[in-house]
Amino acid sequence: MVKKLYDLLIAYVEHKLESVRYEIIGAEKRRAEKRTTDPLDGTERMVAEDSVRLEVEIPRGNGMFSRVRIKVKLLIEEFPISDTDLEEEIFTCIFRNLKITYIASTNDHTVYFKADGCRIYRNDDIDIFKEI
């Protein structure tokens, strides 16, 4: 199997970003219609998928990734922290199974991420505030 430079770059970025403790900037609730196929009869139908898109920033001290902001999609219905709390306090998180899902070919080369969940911390505490 031939290694592809693109696959190596993706794996490198995912590896470097998987254990970073991000500062949570904001959360946006989203609903999208997804096409799904019934495994029993093969019919296609549209299903609503709720998600939350977290905007986070990589803190200083992480080399070339320092101060980079990314948006990460979480397949949850509701984010447990309100916008008001995010403005008043600092919350950080570590994502579980962070993956790059798509890189746009447009001029801005937007990179899309998703994660299976995250651990949320209040301020710089070592105790977990919430796990989703």
Put a short name on every predicted segment:
Residues M1-I132:
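OB-fold and OB-like single-stranded nucleic-acid-recognition modules
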